[in-house]
Amino acid sequence: MSDTIVIVDAGRTAIGTFGGALSALQATDIGTTVLKALIERTGIAPEQVSEVILGQVLTAGCGQNPARQTTLMAGLPHTVPAMTINKVCGSGLKAVHLAMQAVACGDAEIVIAGGQESMSQSSHVLPRSREGQRMGDWPMKDTMIVDGLWDAFNQCHMGVTAENIAKKYAFTREAQDAFAAASQQKAEAAIQSGRFADEIIPVSIPQRKGDPLVFDTDEFPRPGTTAETLGRLRPAFDKQGTVTAGNASGINDGAAMVVVMKESKAKELGLTPMARLVAFSSAGVDPAIMGTGPIPASTDCLKKAGWAPADLDLVEANEAFAAQAMSVNQEMGWDLSKVNVNGGAIAIGHPIGASGARVLVTLLYEMQKRDAKKGLATLCIGGGQGVALAVERL
């Protein structure tokens, strides 16, 4: 790579709950807010953008290429191409990797990458409807479950894969609830202190009467959560299990994006890089324990960067489930005081196509606040994969 690849700006929406503040908006509406804001505040001429690459997992019934829709809705000219990708929970981070590759290869100068998702607006579908059903029940399928939360290989919910990890590592219910409570408490403290304010781009939501609602605060965290309150919840996937709605991530809506270019281009445009993109890795694992994906992905990413876990100043590791996140922390052996310092997806939420970019955006802003040098963003992926991205502040 002859010229350093950098991120010059990053932003995300506040994360909405399932059926919550953002539920009336399509994923493209949510993404448009972020894309438009990044163009405006960087001062980049819309026609200068080489491509827009966005992750979105739940696209059934959303129309052709949602990333393209978002691009044009944000006011970019029709000459700017766009691509929607689906790597399930890793989509938003893989989009950034694709941007990194395109810029490094000289195929693009400026790429805006990230993800968008409305789990609230995901469709129900009627399989085999073109053939018809002569007799019997004809059940619809929930695409949010089938396309987003279901293991196609073992025919089970993602929560069952978390149960598999809990059993493999002998993680108790109490330990998982304590982990989840800590995530909630860190997120609550971060929100109360305005820690996320810089990274959040407000969304204006039209109302039937009066002024639009301005949504600018994550609504999924549950203030006052303790391990004791979580301990009252029933297991969600196995009656004898340990995984509950309280020690798992949420079903959420949101969008997050970053602006990628070469350092020389940033200098030409008078933009100050937030960080350089150092290394990326994807890895595959047994789908039955898909949550362990960040272990080989992070290990390989650090190897490419020439770093050790101890070199990291901050880590954002997506919390799909407490058991899953605990397994990653245990195997990576990194300093837990540097991991998800403002809470993770158990508290903040997990809008699947956007989460990869969300953890990266949060990482970048927290690195600025702490004057941190080296950071890592990583996520597990349904179907048995992991992704990781190493960044360094210049």
UniProtKB/Swiss-Prot annotation:
User: Can you tell which superkingdom this protein's organism belongs to?
Assistant: Bacteria
Q: GO terms for CC?
A: cytoplasm
Q: Which GO terms describe its molecular function?
A: acetyl-CoA C-acetyltransferase activity
Look up keyword Plastid and say if it applies.
no
Kindly give the InterPro entries that the UniProt entry links to this protein: Thiolase, Thiolase-like, Thiolase_acyl_enz_int_AS, Thiolase_AS, Thiolase_C, Thiolase_CS, Thiolase_N
Please give the catalytic activity noted in the UniProt record: 2 acetyl-CoA = acetoacetyl-CoA + CoA
What the entry lists under SUPFAM superfamilies is as follows: Thiolase-like (SSF53901)
Q: Keyword annotations for this protein?
A: Acyltransferase, Cytoplasm, PHB biosynthesis, Transferase
> Which Pfam families does the protein's record reference?
Thiolase_C (PF02803), Thiolase_N (PF00108)
Which residues of this protein are catalytic? 89 (acyl-thioester intermediate), 350 (proton acceptor), 380 (proton acceptor)
Places the protein is found:
Cytoplasm
| UniProt pathway annotation | Biopolymer metabolism; poly-(R)-3-hydroxybutanoate biosynthesis; Metabolic intermediate biosynthesis; (R)-mevalonate biosynthesis; (R)-mevalonate from acetyl-CoA: step 1/3
E.C. number: 2.3.1.9
Q: Which GO terms describe its biological process?
A: poly-hydroxybutyrate biosynthetic process
Q: How does it assemble?
A: Homotetramer.
Record family assignment: Belongs to the thiolase-like superfamily. Thiolase family.
* Name this polypeptide is given: Acetyl-CoA acetyltransferase
- What species is given as this protein's source? Thiocystis violacea
The UniProt gene name for this protein comes to phaA
